């Protein structure tokens, strides 16, 4: 469930940033007029499970993450991006679903391996964070049971968003219900 919550928040963050991108210094009416001419962002989240390979995949077209985000938020248990200064400086007006930074912990508990493929969306570089421009380079990180750290490998992901693949431990794979996962 934590991965689904993260996907929802990633899409909500991108939607809020896309709405505000380029409108930081406009009055509300001008911002609405500008946004009505843009192609609207359409959030997409998918969850897939293959019982033969015991792979559970969460994918979204949200804000995405980069290597810095993985180091500062994903790889640290109990640290949440949505409670960070990085999030608050974006000045977004919505309440994130995930707040506790336990998503990856839950992944490490149920998976034998975990793969993160992501690319950060351009909308993170708004006027609100001109002093800390985010890299938009795609990133792929993998963790295999027994490893102490995540290993980074080359990525050629072109689309903004994140795909997380978990290779489940057999005892969790046999009891998996996508229906229960989303409700």
Task: Describe every region a protein language model picked out.
Residues 7-59, 121:
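ATP-lid-like helix-loop hinge signature
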Residues 7-10, 76-80, 113, 117:
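Conserved, well-folded catalytic cores of nucleic-acid-processing
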Residues 2, 6:
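Conserved polar catalytic motif of the HATPase_c/GHKL fold
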Residues 8-12, 66-68, 73, 174-177:
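Short helix/loop capping segments that flank catalytic or ligand/cofactor-binding pockets
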Residues 49, 60, 82, 116-118, ...:
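Hydrophobic side chains in beta-strands
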Residues 90-183:
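GHKL-type ATPase core
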Residues 51-93:
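Glycine-rich/acidic phosphate-handling loop/turn and adjacent ATP-lid/helix
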């Amino acid at each position: 469930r934590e991965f689904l919550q993260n996907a929802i928040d990633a899409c909500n963050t991108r939607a809020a940033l896309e709405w505000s991108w380029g409108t930081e210094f406009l009055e509300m009416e001008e911002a609405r007029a500008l946004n009505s001419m843009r192609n609207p962002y359409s959030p997409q989240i998918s969850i897939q499970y293959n019982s033969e390979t015991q792979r559970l995949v969460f994918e979204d077209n949200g804000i995405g993450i980069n290597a810095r985000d993985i180091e500062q938020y994903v790889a640290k248990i109990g640290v949440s991006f949505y409670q960070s200064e990085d999030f608050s400086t974006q000045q977004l007006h919505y309440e994130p679903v995930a707040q506790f930074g336990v998503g990856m912990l839950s992944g490490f508990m149920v998976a034998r391996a975990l793969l993160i493929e992501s690319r950060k969306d351009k909308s993170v570089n708004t006027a609100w964070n001109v002093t800390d421009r985010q890299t938009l380079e795609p990133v792929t990180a993998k963790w295999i049971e027994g490893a102490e750290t995540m290993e980074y490998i080359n990525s050629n992901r072109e689309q903004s968003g994140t795909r997380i693949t978990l290779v489940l431990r057999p005892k969790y794979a046999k009891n998996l219900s996508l229906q229960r996962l989303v409700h």
